[in-house]
Design a protein with these regions (language model features):
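Structural and coupling elements of P-loop NTPases
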Residues: 1-216
Length: 216
């Protein structure tokens, strides 16, 4: 969905149709899962992203962990129908260990029985209390964001909403974890998520001397 909406690919693939763009190996298409990390590039609102798609299955967690060392930000995708699972907590601890700023996308919200409020309560309890829904209106999430920082909270009490730069700083410091809800299959909430990425990610400052890190 990210690559399709950003115009990087012209055709929207589906895992269950065995034609997902980044599932290039026959075994991946056959089993409907990602086994090997893949790379793609896309642009949204003048921000250029390099996407590293990693396995979500517990059997291939070593492949995922190797990729973490080169990430500036992470996007943790959670099934809205399943909620936080044991492997979700394992990935969360790995992201914490590596100090990687993290966005969350809660997928499959089109399925019956999914409830955003219940999921948010679970995310706050199971992962971090600084998980905040960014699928709500700005005014509704402002208080939750302000609670992540004392000075922001004081400004919020006086009527000032958190600035975009304030939010970006909290994210990179891992003091705020934006949560977006939607359905990748139906492209619901994906555009909002892309807008959030473009608004709140910051390009790290790299040394002038060339350097590289091999992750696979």
């Amino acid at each position: 969905g990210l690559l399709y909406l950003s115009g990087a690919v012209r055709r929207l693939g589906r895992v269950d149709h065995k034609d997902a763009f980044l599932d290039t190996y026959e075994l991946e298409r056959k089993r409907g899962i990602t086994i090997f990390s893949k790379q793609a590039v896309f642009t949204h609102r003048d921000t250029r992203f390099t996407l590293l798609d990693t396995p979500g299955h517990v059997d291939f967690s070593a492949e995922t962990e190797r990729t973490l060392q080169v990430l500036d930000y992470a996007v943790l995708v959670i099934s809205g129908s399943d909620g936080v699972q044991g492997h979700t907590r394992t990935l969360w601890k790995l992201l914490e260990r590596h100090g990687i700023p993290t966005f969350l996308f809660i997928n499959k919200m089109d399925l019956a029985g999914t409830d955003q409020n219940s999921l948010m309560m679970s995310l706050k309890k199971e992962l971090d209390d600084a998980c905040v829904s960014f699928s709500d209106q700005e005014e509704e999430r402002a208080e939750q964001i302000a609670l992540c920082d004392e000075s922001l909270f004081e400004r919020w009490i006086e009527g000032a909403l958190p600035k975009e730069s304030d939010i970006a700083d909290l994210i990179v410091q891992r003091r705020l974890f934006p949560c977006f809800f939607g359905s990748a299959l139906k492209l619901e909430g994906v555009e909002t998520f892309l807008d959030g990425l473009s608004a709140y990610v910051r390009t790290p400052e790299y040394p002038s001397q060339f350097g590289a890190r091999v992750y696979k």
